[in-house]
Amino acid sequence: MPQSLTLLPQRVLAVAVVITALALAALITLATGQPYVGLTLAIDQDRVVVLGSTAGLDVAPGTEVRGLRSGGTELPLAPVDLTPEPDMAFVRYSDMDAFFERQRARSALLRSGEAWLQLADGRELSLPVTQSRPLRDLPFVFWFQLFCAAGGLLAGASVLAFRWQDPSTRYYALTGTGMLLFAGAASVYSTRELALDGRLFMALSSINEFGALLFC
């Protein structure tokens, strides 16, 4: 057997490992590079409520949130704004575009460095905004999706490396690539804290959709 063919499995696996490592590093960088306030929100029927705060805010769990403010800019916060997967929440493209625009506005407000949390009881709490999210704050779901993304690509590459002439293994490797794309993209936007830049969110959502098509 020619030496080039003998070395093919090692080459395929090496390339797959490098691609996976670079992709994971990029996703972690994106996830931690967002404004952070140490606040966990949740949906309670038709309300947005506080679950907890790691920043020592004087707010009890279950307190209803109305929105964010910075200077003269006030941005209301609705339950739909917390949806982890916009593709499942909106039917019309115009609604999704409006969602991305609200994300952009909130992200810009938080990046301004001064933000206030508006509560339904009329109080406003100053948010201690930092421009990066601590690695320890990333939830289990984020890491699980990264595990799925990496596992998909490496599993596909492992089969392709040893049976690269079989068309079915090439298709299997393609589905693994799709898993890397859709699970990796979703890991960033589905576990965001308060907001993600709208353009980045839109790009990640498109990558997620493309990856899902490859996977199917």
Spell out what each predicted region is.
Residues 1-35:
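Interdomain regulatory linker/hinge segments that flank or connect interaction modules
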Residues 46, 113-115, 123-125:
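Envelope-exposed proteins and targeting segments
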Residues 68-115:
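PDZ domains, with a preference for the canonical peptide-binding region formed by the helix
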Residues 118-143:
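Short, aromatic-rich amphipathic segments at membrane interfaces
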Residues 62-65, 115-117, 164:
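Terminal peptide-recognition signature
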Residues 137-159, 163-216:
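Individual alpha-helical transmembrane segments in multi-pass integral membrane proteins
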Residues 30-81:
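PDZ/PDZ-like domain segments forming the peptide/carboxylate-binding groove
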